[in-house]
Amino acid sequence: MAGNFNQIEKIGDYTVITASMNYASTTQLLAKRGMDILGGLVGCIITLIVTIFVGPAIYIASPGPIFFAQERIGRNGRKFKMYKFRSMYMDAEERKKELMSQNKVSDGMMFKMDFDPRIIGNKILPDGTKKTGIGQFIRKTSIDELPQFWNILKGDMSLVGTRPPTLDEWDKYEPHHRARMSFRPGLTGLWQVSGRSNITDFEEVVKLDTQYINEWSVKGDIEIIWQTAIGVLRNDGAM
């Protein structure tokens, strides 16, 4: 089923040719979008219920907005606002620069730390003991990702796809890295269920994302959703 597919689209004031690494029929695309709409609706209802409990806990621990909106890169380089429950302190983005030397992904294409002090409640006590709070809890259980069901319902994202990079990560991409964004970004994906947060080699992420795009099928998406659900229940790592 794999194959290249190009189409002419309007992005802002520009008319451009966009590309897909895997051609899918209209029926297949409608099936995927149908899954997204259904999943998005159910997910938004769950998110509203969870907000009743998680929202106050976030605000008490770190006064400020309970939701976090960040500009991300979507399909074919489009920018969109991605939503999460706020799991970090308000100055997290500013502090990120100070912590880059501790980034587990050496090439800087993603940012991962073993114990991130920007997460709400995270602190190292004088005796070296590490203390966590609501921020670590909602990240470990992937509750912080729930607001992205709104992105899915809007069409910015899909239930399954490639994870959307931040603008600074996108600027560092080489041409073969950008190919992973020829598909609509997803809440979960192949690399998440292949190692979830444990993967620290960005080239491995690109390899798995490219494999997902080339071998995409509705059945494959269902399998990834199932594996993601099992991973979350087992606390295999944050999405």
Describe these PLM feature segments.
Residues 41, 56, 65, 75, ...:
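Gly/Ser/Thr-rich helix-start
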Residues 26-95, 151, 218-239:
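A hydrophobic, helix-centered structural microdomain
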Residues 5-6, 162, 167-180, 184-185, ...:
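Cytosol-/stroma-facing membrane-proximal "stalk/adaptor" domains immediately downstream
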Residues 5-8, 68-130, 188-209:
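Short, glycine-rich, amphipathic interfacial segments at transmembrane boundaries or analogous
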Residues 50, 130, 142-143, 198, ...:
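Amphipathic alpha-helical protein-protein interaction surfaces
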Residues 3-41, 66-70, 196, 200-218:
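Glycine-rich flexible loop motifs, especially short His-Gly-Gly/GGXG/HXGH segments used as catalytic or interaction
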Residues 108-183, 224-232:
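A short, structured surface patch at a secondary-structure boundary
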